[in-house]
Amino acid sequence: LIQPEPNYYNYWCSQVHGLCHEDTDDAPVFPKVWAQIEPLIENLPLVAHNKPFDEGCLKAVFRVYQMDYPDYEFYDTLCVSRRVLPDLENHQLQTVAAACGYMLDNHHHALADAEACAWIAREIL
């Protein structure tokens, strides 16, 4: 977990993600976590299911800490899923994951969502 700035969770976010400020009181702030993550990414592309949302969040945290945003190549599994799986009832992460053979049991948990997105990317990108 990363401590957000400010370390505040509104009711909706707590309901969706199951987190509150006590969960992140002792968590590191973004610049410390980024220093560990950035060398692992190097120049690899990023992948998200709904790129505009995730990239917007990532850009916002870089702005908060006055850090230069590294302009990574960024793929969107949501956009691609609409093109290659047009007959799905919807294109929510859990629906697309299931169509690709992955059962997402803990939706809105960051690691579970990332694993589902990676599975989808491997199947349709």
What are these model-derived regions, one by one?
Residues 1-71, 86-108:
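Conserved non-catalytic scaffold segment of RNase H-like nuclease domains
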Residues 58, 80, 117-121:
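Buried hydrophobic packing segments
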Residues 63, 82-83, 122:
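Arginine residue identity/basic-tract feature
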Residues 68-81:
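Conserved beta-strand -> loop -> alpha-helix junction used to position metal-binding or nucleic-acid-contacting
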Residues 85-87, 124-125:
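Short helix-capping/linker segments at secondary-structure and domain boundaries
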Residues 99, 118-125:
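Acidic two-metal-ion nuclease catalytic site recognized across multiple nuclease folds
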Residues 113:
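Conserved catalytic/binding loops enriched for acidic/polar residues
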